[in-house]
Amino acid sequence: MILLNSKKRLATLLIVLIFGIIIFILDLGATGLVDETPPLFAAAARAMSESGDWLTPKVNGIFRFDKPPLIYWLMGFFYSLPKIEIWDSLGTISARLPSSLGSLFLMLMIADTLFCWPQKGDKQFFTPIAGSLGFALSPLIIIWSRTAVSDALLTGTLGISLLLFWRRMASENNDKCIAAWAFLGFAILTKGPVAFVLATLTITFFLIIQKDWRSLLNKINPKKGFLITILISVPWYVLELLREGRPFWDNFFGYHNFQRYTSVVNNHSEPIWFFLYIMILASLPFTPFLYHGIFIAFREFLKSLKESCGVPDSLYTYSLCWLSAVLIFFSISATKLPSYWLPAIPAAAILISNSFISLKNTNKTYVYLWIFNIFILFGVSMAFFFSNYWLSSINDPEMPNLASELISSGIIFKAKLFFSSFTLLAIILFFLKSRNILLYLQILLLVGQSYLMSPIRKLADTSRQLPLRNISKLILDIREGRETLAMIGLSLIHI
């Protein structure tokens, strides 16, 4: 470990912070909440703030037992801040901030870990920024970090916890590992027992392959640490069980945890290899380097079986254990959703950075991987140049004019321009044998995030959510007393 309170470390984290604010915070409240689930989260949190009942999440008096309360508490806290009607007129900043901040803090933790514990071949400035951007620019992270549900917050709290566990095992100081266990408690308060299961699997996989596993286990202080996790996470479950009894037990533990894992819920049935497919999408456009990073980490693990390898040099092996834990656990699950892969993306980002660091630009593997990657980028560019063939297949009853609006708004043209420029730059940097090609392309993707994603979000909001907000405003103007509004397909709603 490099124990530095150096200007270089602070500068690196400041750069990562600025990038994170651009990706996760910028224009966070410019659009309304989309779909059914995020508004329900927001409504439950707002009800907590207004009623003062911070124990049981409810929407219009109806219990919501699907998730633990941390996401509601954080949303409710932001809803309780003064002058919210000025700085959050749509109420979407308050609803989305927990997800955004969870991803932002995890991004900083990834950068700091890669800076303070450089692995073999790492560049102390390049690797932390590239690794953290690899996480933040994942298509799934970009989407869920701006969505008012609990998945990104789980990824943030669990990811920080797992990195802190490894940092403790890699460190020679006498830290009691309190923070790691505390964040694990927060993760359990975000999504439930699944957080504890994933953390246990990751650490168990890692310890099994370590020769001095007993000393490493003692380092993370499991007896006192587990007590900290229990003190943070368990009291709410006990209080909720005492208040609501059997309905809470059956709904939360029975349906939303056990039944979701053992049987298909809401028609979300997918084949066992589903997350191998999601892994490809989640790591675009650098997916080939993820698989190479996995190969390199596995090779280093096999090498460590023959030669002694210190824990400070084992971050990539630990990341492989982390990714494997998520992959195995959710592949066995009967119910499968793309969001289940989010907790593995921090590990995937670290493995992608491992791939770039381990390759030299004269290496044949490097050449083959980049040629494959350029073909992927070229394919994406061509998809937009021939968009007329697939735009007509878009059939969304809630946005019937979406295809024509994508063209008339200029978004399709911008996508053609951006991805063709991106592909061309990748080819130029490849032939110039640039050492920092990954970082340059990531920065261009960062620009593209604002150039493309922001207009797309605003177009979707204008087409889908703005009409609903206009109707809601009209209803508030003509409503008499506490009349109830009935909407087809939804429960009774008080506006």
Predicted regions and their residues:
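Membrane-integral, polyisoprenol-dependent glycosyltransferases
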Residues: 1-366, 386-387, 461
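Membrane-embedded architecture of ER/inner-membrane glycosylation machinery
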Residues: 2-4, 9, 178, 296-492
